[in-house]
Regions:
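Alpha-helical structural motif
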Residues: 18-21, 59, 73, 92
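Polar/charged low-complexity regulatory segments
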Residues: 2-40, 49, 96-147
Length: 147
């Protein structure tokens, strides 16, 4: 088994605060801090990670520093978010969640993920980023751990 891990918490998952993708962001930064994030994954990328930080009004480096220094459990991380988020209203959370759930990858990204997974790019194929990222994670997990 690998000494690094593919993050398997979906971007579609929310913790008690109700913010989708936040548990995945915590997992990826935590794994990177421990030197255990699979090399093909950024701890904080320009997609859902950046969207989530921006929606909450959190600074990337402050989040990284907190996780590095404190190695928090997920509820401890959410407590930090609750304390420091600049926009944590129900409306802001719902707007963010809708943006994440409604995001579609570009054609090239979709085709690449579907091809790697051996799936046809037809009318039944997922188009949304969350579903495609799940497929990509499961494929990467299979390659790294099960193959």
């Amino acid at each position: 088994m690998s000494d690094t891990y593919v993050p398997l918490i979906s971007s579609g998952v929310a913790g008690p605060l109700g913010v989708v993708h936040l548990p995945r962001l915590w997992q990826k930064v935590s794994l990177e801090t421990a030197g255990k994030l699979a090399s093909s994954y950024p701890a904080v990328g320009k997609g859902f990670d950046a969207m989530t930080l921006a929606a909450l009004g959190l600074e990337e480096q402050a989040v990284r520093n907190y996780i590095k220094q404190n190695k928090p459990t997920y509820p401890q991380f959410e407590a930090l978010v609750k304390k420091n988020a600049k926009s944590l209203t129900r409306e802001a959370i719902e707007k963010h969640n809708a943006a994440v759930r409604g995001y579609n990858h570009d054609d090239e990204t979709r085709q690449s993920i579907l091809s790697a997974c051996g799936m046809a790019d037809d009318a039944s194929a997922p188009r949304d980023g969350v579903s495609l990222n799940n497929l990509d994670d499961w494929y990467e997990f299979h390659q790294a751990v099960l193959k």
